[in-house]
């Protein structure tokens, strides 16, 4: 018998999905989507909407699990500085706490379910953004270093929002989503782990401040050695055309200036190695900081330079480490003051 089955429906469906896939993967769009973008856009939109809503409207959260809720929303008297999305309750611990795990929406808000919602959607969305960076570079035939550089802030955020709460046993120990909450997290982290004395944190400080210094030095050197292509009464910027093949500044002039200002080998004579250094310095340092936070999440503080100095007779030689330790004890006994029966956490 002759097969009269109509294949036009499948042909139309195939052409439709071919168009959709072509649109998703097109590098000609004003905003590249990509396979990772399908995941990234809804996740980041959900995280952003939930964060803004919670920052403005969320009711107080029982962060310590002792029935003393803490208000973080603007409608409860906070301002931009003091406002925050309060971390999930200590009564929840590290349990996954979607809204259907609570008896009702009010209970979910009271236990800080919004924090987990925002943090997990944000981390997954930021990870998808990093994957999208790699995917777009791959489509254009570029090298993959852009997504490698973005991995630094991603692992740093993952360390304070995910790894540290898991290591400490509760999302209530995660960093609050607000300005003053961030400072509170830093003070408590210092009190409990003495991170200022950790070499990995020191590397991170060198990365951030050093990266700022190197960026300012590079930008000022380039701006000071631009090749003049215009008359004296016109801005140097007019002499630059987007996509031009000619160099826009004299690296030899910048190299000669800086080499004589400091010393010869402090200056790069290769533009490629220079820009790789500018990218690698802060990225590697922030990797180390994230690693330090992640190890301290599990109370592995053995690398700290916080030991007191004892002479051969057993007498204490006062040092900066002792001053910092005393300050840490003061901060430790003051935070979560109603939740503790002892000066130190029994962690």
From Swiss-Prot:
HAMAP family cross-referenced by the UniProt entry: PSII_PsbA_D1 (MF_01379)
Binding locations of chlorophyll a PD1: 201
Site positions (Stabilizes free radical intermediate): 193
Protein name: Photosystem II protein D1
Ligand binding (chlorophyll a ChlzD1): 121
Segments crossing the lipid bilayer: 32-49, 121-136, 145-159, 200-221, 277-291
Keywords, comma-separated and alphabetical: Calcium, Chlorophyll, Chloroplast, Chromophore, Electron transport, Herbicide resistance, Iron, Magnesium, Manganese, Membrane, Metal-binding, Oxidoreductase, Photosynthesis, Photosystem II, Plastid, Thylakoid, Transmembrane, Transmembrane helix, Transport
Primary role: Photosystem II (PSII) is a light-driven water:plastoquinone oxidoreductase that uses light energy to abstract electrons from H(2)O, generating O(2) and a proton gradient subsequently used for ATP formation. It consists of a core antenna complex that captures photons, and an electron transfer chain that converts photonic excitation into a charge separation. The D1/D2 (PsbA/PsbD) reaction center heterodimer binds P680, the primary electron donor of PSII as well as several subsequent electron acceptors.
GO cellular component, one term: chloroplast thylakoid membrane
Taxonomic placement: Eukaryota, Sar, Alveolata, Dinophyceae, Peridiniales
Additional free-text comment from the UniProt record: 2 of the reaction center chlorophylls (ChlD1 and ChlD2) are entirely coordinated by water.
Reactions catalysed, as given in the entry: 2 a plastoquinone + 4 hnu + 2 H2O = 2 a plastoquinol + O2
């Amino acid at each position: 018998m002759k097969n009269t089955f109509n294949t036009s429906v499948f042909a139309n469906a195939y052409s439709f999905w071919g168009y959709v896939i072509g649109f998703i993967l097109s590098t000609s769009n004003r905003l590249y989507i990509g396979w990772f973008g399908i995941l990234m856009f809804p996740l980041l939109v959900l995280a952003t909407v939930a964060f803004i809503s919670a920052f403005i409207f969320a009711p107080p959260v029982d962060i310590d699990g002792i029935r003393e809720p803490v208000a973080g929303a603007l409608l409860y008297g906070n301002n931009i500085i003091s406002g925050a999305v309060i971390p999930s309750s200590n009564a929840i611990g590290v349990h996954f706490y979607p809204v259907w795990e609570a008896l009702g929406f009010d209970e979910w808000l009271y236990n800080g379910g919004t924090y987990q919602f925002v943090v997990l959607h944000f981390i997954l969305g930021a990870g998808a953004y990093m994957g999208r960076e790699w995917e777009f570079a791959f489509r254009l035939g570029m090298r993959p270093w852009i997504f490698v550089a973005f991995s630094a802030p991603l692992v740093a955020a993952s360390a304070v929002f995910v790894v540290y709460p898991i290591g400490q046993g509760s999302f209530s120990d995660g960093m609050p989503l607000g300005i003053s909450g961030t400072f509170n997290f830093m003070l408590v982290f210092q009190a409990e782990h003495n991170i200022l004395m950790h070499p990995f944190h020191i590397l991170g400080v060198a990365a951030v401040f050093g990266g700022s210094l190197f960026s300012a030095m590079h930008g000022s050197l380039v701006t000071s050695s631009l090749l003049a292509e215009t008359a004296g009464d016109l801005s140097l910027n007019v002499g630059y055309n987007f996509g031009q093949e000619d160099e826009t500044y004299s690296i030899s002039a910048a190299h000669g200036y800086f080499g004589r200002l400091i010393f010869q080998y402090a200056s790069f004579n290769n533009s490629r190695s220079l820009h790789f250094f500018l990218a690698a310095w802060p990225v590697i340092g922030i990797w180390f900081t994230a690693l330090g936070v992640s190890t301290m999440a599990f109370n592995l503080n053995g690398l700290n330079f916080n030991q007191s100095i004892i002479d051969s007779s057993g007498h204490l030689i006062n040092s900066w480490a002792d001053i910092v330790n005393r300050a840490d004890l003061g901060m430790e006994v003051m935070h979560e003051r109603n939740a503790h029966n002892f000066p130190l956490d029994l962690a």
